């Protein structure tokens, strides 16, 4: 369902899930990250496309399991043949008209054996031919029509090559590996998409917190300008100082405007990711960045979860499983092809169509056959090299799995180290912000006493804005690192209580 086709009822249902607030004359929906992720799972077209891919892979398994369906073949034929021969009594022969009905039922079993039944009904009538010379042939008497009925039971048993359920169920196993791959690819893509949306969300948080800080800077600049204008009118301040205050105010207002424009762009990114290009309200992130120190577990348990959850390792294991199946296929090709074909036939004759079936119980008309055939693959270098190739590829995948485990361990160490560094940086940024705020307040007091200038105040004001901006960035980076850890460990769905894990 495309966002453009949202009905008023659907928009109303979405609005009921949020709280509204006014911000700069604009209606804003306060949205926590949990709700954003829930809507992403419900509406993102990319996730819906992934579900179709998984469903398509599952249908291939059903098809592979039903590959050995029974087969019924029926044919009807008519033939006429004539022949002449020469004898001492003259030239003569016969002409035969035949109608043949054949029906065969066969099925291959999952263990490689094939059985079947064939019923044949043949109705014939012969006419005698005489020829006074070879150029003139005439028919004489016609014999009575008769029918021949036969029922055959056939069984083919492979002993080495193509024998057993393990070999014959290889198509099912390959299809099941395909399902595993589709599910893992879907899981990886889904987590990547959710991580991307969450990262955009935290960017939006950073921008709106910066907007609030910039509003404070604008308020300070406005108050400072009013104070300076009042002091100028009282003759206590030069016009240059007032002009400097006006310049700082314009600079702060311009920065605020740029931040608001940036917020709209990032908000558009969120709505595009959620497949909601048209909404009657804006989006305001209600979550605040946190340190999450209580959510961090010990490195050993985190590494264990990461290794269990990593889709690259799981995909490599699925690839290794498929290589093992392909090795079985090559080994099966190199096996001796030894087959036993058994057949037992019942026959009956009658002057009436299908009347011969009543004679099937006559053992004198029964027949049987047994054929043992075998073939040895001599010098099949192609299959041998193919088998060697699959063994080498299996070993390659095993090494790739170990390499990925080592990579994840280093990545976890890097993330945990970044947590410690970010926490220290955040404490430093907070301390710098407090000092910058004190310095700004002191400088404003000195300005009122005529011991400072508006330019110096603006410099301290910019220092405070930069330090607070750094504090916001540190907190947001902490959230993004924590988000990466949730994705790696497979805890994203559990942490935000999301459906459909």
Where does each model-flagged region fall?
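Bacterial Sec-pathway N-terminal export signals of envelope proteins
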Residues: 2-98, 155-170, 174, 285-321, ...
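Sec/SRP-type N-terminal targeting helices
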Residues: 48-53, 65-66, 110-134, 141-145, ...
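C-terminal structured "cap/appendage" subdomains that terminate the fold
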Residues: 439-479
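A short glycine-centered flexible hinge/capping loop motif at secondary-structure junctions
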Residues: 232-239, 447-451, 488
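Periplasmic alpha-helical coiled-coil/stalk elements that build and connect Gram-negative outer-membrane
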Residues: 183-305, 418, 422-425, 463-465, ...
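Small/polar, glycine/serine/threonine/aspartate-rich low-complexity segments that form flexible
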Residues: 24-28, 76-153, 285-296, 327-332, ...
């Amino acid at each position: 369902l495309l966002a453009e086709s949202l009905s008023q009822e659907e928009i109303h249902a979405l609005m009921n899930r949020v709280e509204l607030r006014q911000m700069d004359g604009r209606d804003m929906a306060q949205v926590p990250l949990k709700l954003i992720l829930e809507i992403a799972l419900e509406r993102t077209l990319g996730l819906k496309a992934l579900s179709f891919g998984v469903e398509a892979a599952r249908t291939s398994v059903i098809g592979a399991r039903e590959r050995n369906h029974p087969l019924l073949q029926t044919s009807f034929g008519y033939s006429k043949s004539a022949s002449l021969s020469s004898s001492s009594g003259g030239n003569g022969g016969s002409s035969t008209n035949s109608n043949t009905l054949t029906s065969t039922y066969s099925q291959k079993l999952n263990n490689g054996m094939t059985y079947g039944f064939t019923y044949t009904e043949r109705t014939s009538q012969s006419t005698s031919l005489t020829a006074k010379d070879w150029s003139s042939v005439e028919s004489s008497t016609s014999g009575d029509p008769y029918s021949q009925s036969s029922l055959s039971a056939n069984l083919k048993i492979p002993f080495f090559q193509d024998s057993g359920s393990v070999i014959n169920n290889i198509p099912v196993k390959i299809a099941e590996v395909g399902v595993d791959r589709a599910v893992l690819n879907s899981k990886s893509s889904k987590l990547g998409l959710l991580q991307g949306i969450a990262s955009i969300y935290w960017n939006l948080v950073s921008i709106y917190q910066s907007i609030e800080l910039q509003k404070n800077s604008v308020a300070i600049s406005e108050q400072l300008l009013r104070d300076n204008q009042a002091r100028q009118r009282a003759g206590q301040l030069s016009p240059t100082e007032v002009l400097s205050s006006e310049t700082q105010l314009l600079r702060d207002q311009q920065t605020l405007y740029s931040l608001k424009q940036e917020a709209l762009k990032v908000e558009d990114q969120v709505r595009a990711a959620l497949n909601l290009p048209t909404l009657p309200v804006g989006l305001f992130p209600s979550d605040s960045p946190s340190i999450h120190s209580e959510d961090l577990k010990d490195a050993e348990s985190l590494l264990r979860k990461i290794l269990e959850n990593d889709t690259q390792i799981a995909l490599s294991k699925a690839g290794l499983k498929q290589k093992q199946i392909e090795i079985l296929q090559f080994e099966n090709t190199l096996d001796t092809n030894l087959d036993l074909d058994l057949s037992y036939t019942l026959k009956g004759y009658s002057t009436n169509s299908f009347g011969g079936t009543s004679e099937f119980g006559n053992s004198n008309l029964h027949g049987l056959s047994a054929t043992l055939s075998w073939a040895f693959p001599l010098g099949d270098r192609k299959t041998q090299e193919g088998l060697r190739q699959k063994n080498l590829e299996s070993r390659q995948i095993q090494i790739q799995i170990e390499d990925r485990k080592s990579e994840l361990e280093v990545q976890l160490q890097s993330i945990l180290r970044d947590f410690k560094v970010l926490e220290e940086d955040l404490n430093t940024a907070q301390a710098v912000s407090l000092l910058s705020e004190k310095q700004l307040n002191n400088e404003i007091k000195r300005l009122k006493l005529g011991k400072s200038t508006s330019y110096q105040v603006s410099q301290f004001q910019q220092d405070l804005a930069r330090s607070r901006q750094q504090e916001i960035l540190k907190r947001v980076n902490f959230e993004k690192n924590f988000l990466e850890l949730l994705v790696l460990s497979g805890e994203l769905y559990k942490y935000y209580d999301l459906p459909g894990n």
